[in-house]
Regions:
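Conserved ATP-binding/catalytic motifs of P-loop helicase motor domains
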Residues: 1-108
Length: 108
């Protein structure tokens, strides 16, 4: 799969801004977007941003509970440094099987 790691600094507002930019970039490529939040707090924080209101935002647990990957889409992982090894392998395996682009943000 296509994989990129996007590193950046900043608190919750900075993370939302970075996420909105990545979503816009993926949309400009004609891709559907799925967002995986680091935890429930981040998930709620992202859902409050109007720019992300139409996006599917799930938690990391969804990876291990059978996340459905949309072929040809983009999956954006918030705070990717918090993924476990098993979650990372599940993500990359699913992405490879469904030709999914993966963008992982690293909050530094």
């Amino acid at each position: 799969p296509s994989l990129a790691i996007v590193s950046g600094q900043g608190g919750a507002a900075g993370q939302r801004e970075r996420m909105a930019e990545l979503v816009m970039m993926a949309r400009e490529q004609g891709r559907e977007v799925q967002i995986i939040a680091a935890d429930r707090r981040s998930q709620m924080n992202l859902k409050q941003d109007e720019r992300l209101s139409g996006e599917l935002i799930t938690g990391r647990r969804q990876l291990l509970e059978g996340m459905a990957f949309t072929p040809g889409s983009t999956v954006i992982v918030d705070q990717g440094e918090k993924l476990s090894l098993k979650e990372t392998l599940t993500l990359l395996d699913g992405a490879a099987r469904h030709n999914v682009q993966v963008l992982i943000t690293d909050s530094g």
